[in-house]
Amino acid sequence: MILGIGSDFCDARRIEKSIERFGARFTERVFTPLERAKAERRARPAETYAKRFAAKEACAKALGTGIARGVFWRDMGVVNLPSGQPTLELTGGAAARLKEMVPEGYEPRIALSLTDEGPLSAAYVIISAELIGTPR
């Protein structure tokens, strides 16, 4: 069953301006250490950060909270499965909110799709619940 859907767009030029203006204060407030390490290895870190920023916004919308009510930026981190598929790892307030959303006897699933074209990035998040033991 679908519990929440969120989407967001982000312009890497906006992220780049925030990094120029605030530097590490911005990146450390918004992104997990893993996300920062990945972005800083890239030729165009702002584009990598923009995809992750869009994913966090989309996830916060799917959670039904936005970046509020105890859900903070670093509570949502984009990680890759061994297959390379992106997903979200939730901690803190985001994990607590996810737990509230999932009915007893079910387990959460988070689907994340990321795309970009030039400086523009988009993310789509679907939070669903499946009966415990349902094959993936």
Curated annotation (Swiss-Prot):
It comes from the Bacteria. One of its GO terms (molecular function) is magnesium ion binding. Mg(2+) binds at D8, E57. It catalyses: apo-[ACP] + CoA = holo-[ACP] + adenosine 3',5'-bisphosphate + H(+). GO terms for biological process: fatty acid biosynthetic process. Its cofactor is Mg(2+). GO terms for cellular component: cytoplasm. Pfam families: ACPS (PF01648). It is found in: Cytoplasm. Keywords: Cytoplasm, Fatty acid biosynthesis, Fatty acid metabolism, Lipid biosynthesis, Lipid metabolism, Magnesium, Metal-binding, Transferase. Its main location: cytoplasm. It is an enzyme of class 2 (transferase). Its EC number is 2.7.8.7. InterPro entries: 4-PPantetheinyl_Trfase_dom (IPR008278), 4-PPantetheinyl_Trfase_dom_sf (IPR037143), ACPS (IPR002582), Ppantetheine-prot_Trfase_dom (IPR004568). Transfers the 4'-phosphopantetheine moiety from coenzyme A to a Ser of acyl-carrier-protein. NCBIfam families: acpS (TIGR00516), pantethn_trn (TIGR00556). Belongs to the P-Pant transferase superfamily. AcpS family. This is Holo-[acyl-carrier-protein] synthase. It comes from Azorhizobium caulinodans (strain ATCC 43989 / DSM 5975 / JCM 20966 / LMG 6465 / NBRC 14845 / NCIMB 13405 / ORS 571).
